[in-house]
UniProtKB/Swiss-Prot annotation:
Family: Belongs to the MdcG family.
Protein name, entry field: Phosphoribosyl-dephospho-CoA transferase
Reactions this protein catalyses: apo-[malonate decarboxylase ACP] + 2'-(5''-triphospho-alpha-D-ribosyl)-3'-dephospho-CoA = holo-[malonate decarboxylase ACP] + diphosphate
Keywords annotated in UniProt: Nucleotidyltransferase, Transferase
Function field: Transfers 2'-(5-triphosphoribosyl)-3'-dephosphocoenzyme-A to the apo-[acyl-carrier-protein] of the malonate decarboxylase to yield holo-[acyl-carrier-protein].
The keyword Cell inner membrane belongs to this UniProt entry's keyword annotation: no
Enzyme Commission no: 2.7.7.66
GO terms of molecular function: nucleotidyltransferase activity
Catalytic residue list: D129, D131
Keyword Oxidoreductase: no
Length: 204
């Protein structure tokens, strides 16, 4: 099993792994065998930072999971939409799949769309956005980022793409802008950087 990465879904976390003051909905999530999602945070060896997802944005909980409890692991790259859907977010995923495949980079859906595709649970609705992760181990030219964003903005719903670099993640929309510095989400917290692929620079 590979080391868990942000946005991976993990199965196997026991209810006993939750803090004693965890809300009832979180206990029910684990008791029903639902996965948790890997968060971008540092923790002690042998543990991984995860998040639990309930109904709606109000039901979110951060926790820690033992690596030895992981029974199954699935990354966004393994998730694809099959068949037709009435929901714009899933329609958007189907429409942009050829565009992203042509880039030759690893990518996949995260957020509600990824969760639904991985679990079969109906969490996507008419107002859902599409969240995508695009692994970019090498620098992506800002002109290329703008070209890709122009294509994605023609989809039937808003698409938010995170470019996963060796140092962390940056929003495609922000990298495609003309900002001198962009927000890089790293395991050690957010940083403003001029180059997300270079050594992280702390904003003054």
């Amino acid at each position: 099993m590979n080391a868990p990465r942000p946005h991976d879904l993990l199965w196997g976390m026991p209810v006993s792994g939750l803090p004693t003051d965890a809300p009832q909905w979180a206990l029910e999530v684990l008791a029903s065998g639902q996965p948790v999602v890997v968060r971008r945070a540092t923790c002690e060896a042998g543990w991984v930072a995860v998040g639990l997802r309930g109904h709606g944005r109000a039901q979110r909980l951060g926790a820690l999971m033992r690596l030895t409890d992981i029974q199954r692991q699935q990354g966004p790259e393994a998730l694809r939409v099959h068949g037709q859907s009435p929901w714009p977010a899933l329609q958007a995923l189907a429409s942009v799949t050829p565009v992203l495949q042509a880039r030759g980079l690893a990518w996949g859906p995260t957020g509600g769309v990824g969760y639904q595709l991985a679990t079969g649970m109906e969490v996507v609705h008419a107002g859902s956005d599409l969240d995508l992760l695009l692994r970019t181990p090498r620098p992506l030219a800002r002109a290329q980022a703008r070209e890709l964003l122009d294509i994605l903005d023609c989809a039937p719903c808003r698409i938010d793409v995170q470019l996963e670099t060796p140092s962390g993640a940056v929003a495609l929309r922000e990298w495609a802008s003309f900002a001198l510095r962009v927000l890089l989400k790293s395991p050690h917290g957010p940083r403003l950087v001029s180059d997300p692929w270079a050594v992280m620079e702390r904003a003054p």
